[in-house]
Regions:
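Auxiliary, metal-adjacent structural segments of Zn-dependent hydrolase domains
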Residues: 170-228
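Pan-zinc metallopeptidase signature
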Residues: 24-26, 310-379
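Post-HEXXH active-site segment of zinc metalloproteases
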Residues: 265-293
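Active-site recognition of the HExxH zinc-binding catalytic motif
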Residues: 249-273
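Long, mid-chain structured domain cores
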Residues: 84-184
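N-terminal mature-domain "stem" immediately C-terminal to a signal peptide or N-terminal signal-anchor/transmembrane
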Residues: 21-122, 340-350, 354, 358-362
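Active-site scaffold of zinc-dependent metalloenzymes
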Residues: 133-137, 217-249
């Protein structure tokens, strides 16, 4: 199968557009804040799942098993019920958008939250207005594509009897949510991050789809002093080649390295100028021949990605204390994943951050940045 280098973590920076230019993304009213404060929500959103299915049957989706998870009975069900409609004009339109820029995957699926089904029509959501407007500094949109193609999406849903398909798979969706609640340790991760960083978050929301594979990303929304971290993730995996503990570490890593973007980002912004100097020689830190590294175009983005994964190793030191096998698996896994993706100094970075934390057990990770940046500068 063809891939296009989407096996990496994307962070949607909402700060790349000025307040004057950017349209309002969300509206967290009192009812929303009360319902979500201090809570974790995992959802297979109905309109979002429709768009995942529509993308899955585009030519781009059918040939790309990194963009679309193409294994399991659910994918077989999708093909059985929907592949016959792959020549529909709206599917061809979405395919052309994907071929023009693969990041349209995010703009299409991410903006589905701005609508809910009401019968056969899409009704505007009052809390999520235009949530996915830009991906880093690379691509920005000013018109919600779900609004643009609303009529065609509604017609496709009716023609394919999508809502019946979604209802028939409700039990499967519920099991995905239950697995996250039972095995992902999200509350433990949340508690650890808020203990070790200065950042505070009001709510975590996971938007999941059985059709998500390599393209996982996270973003945050703030309105009325309420901060929500939203992660877009695949279902938890159980690899038969791994032990139960290794599977736990693996699945925790997938989620943790989405969550902690929102914690490492604040001190990175504080020390941006120092980081730009310390990591100015890009070729020391990134193998630019690796596909996907172009989405980390500056020192701050590179530093953040190193921090995201190596902070997970600090978490493992606490979460799996005394379990040397689990900690070693986490260490080897982190180093292998980032090296494959082109972040070749991960092991040294990992070791240095661990040493700093062990030597300064009472300090927040934010406070370790000056020493870590100085170490980077000396490399």
């Amino acid at each position: 199968m063809k891939t296009i280098g989407l096996f990496f973590t994307l962070l949607l920076f909402i700060t790349t557009i000025s307040a004057q230019e950017k349209q309002k993304q969300v509206s967290f009213d009192a009812k929303f804040r009360k319902a979500h404060q201090g809570k974790v929500k995992i959802e297979i959103h109905e309109v979002k799942e429709l768009l995942h299915i529509m993308i899955a049957i585009t030519a781009s989706g059918l040939e790309n098993d990194d963009m679309v998870a193409q294994t399991g009975n659910y994918y077989k069900d999708v093909l059985k019920d929907f592949e016959a409609f792959k020549q529909e004009p709206i599917i061809l339109t979405f395919d052309s958008l994907m071929k023009a820029n693969p990041l349209n995957y995010i703009f299409l699926t991410g903006n589905t939250l701005s609508y809910q089904f009401k019968g056969n029509k899409l009704k505007a959501d009052k809390n999520y207005l235009f949530p996915a407007q830009n991906v880093s500094s690379h691509t920005t949109i000013t018109v919600n594509p779900i609004t643009t193609y609303k009529k065609e999406i509604e017609q496709f849903a009716v023609k394919t009897r999508f809502r019946k398909f979604y209802k028939q798979h409700t039990a499967f969706y519920r099991q995905i949510v239950a697995d996250y609640n039972n095995f992902a340790n999200l509350q433990q991760q949340w508690d650890w991050l808020e203990k070790n960083f200065n950042t505070r978050v009001n709510n975590y929301t996971i938007m999941c789809s059985p059709l998500i594979n390599g393209l996982n990303y996270t973003t945050s929304y703030t309105d009325n002093d309420f901060k929500q971290i939203m992660m877009v993730l695949p279902p938890l995996e159980k690899n038969p080649a791994l032990t139960d503990k290794q599977n736990q570490v693996f699945n925790t890593r997938i989620m943790f390295t989405e969550i902690d973007h929102n914690y490492v980002g604040a001190p990175t912004k504080t020390y941006k100028e120092q980081i730009n100097i310390a990591l100015q020689d890009r070729h020391k830190w990134v193998d630019t021949t690796k596909e996907g590294t172009e989405y980390y175009p500056n020192p701050s983005r590179v530093f953040d990605e190193y921090m995201t994964f190596t902070t997970f190793y600090l978490f493992c030191q606490d979460a799996f204390a005394g379990d040397n096998a689990a900690i070693k698996y986490a260490y080897d896994d982190i180093n292998a994943v980032l090296k494959i993706r082109g972040f070749m100094k991960v092991q040294a970075f990992n070791d240095e951050l661990l040493k700093l934390k062990q030597n300064n057990p009472g300090k927040k990770i934010d406070e370790l940045y000056p020493q870590l940046i100085e170490w980077c500068k000396q490399q």
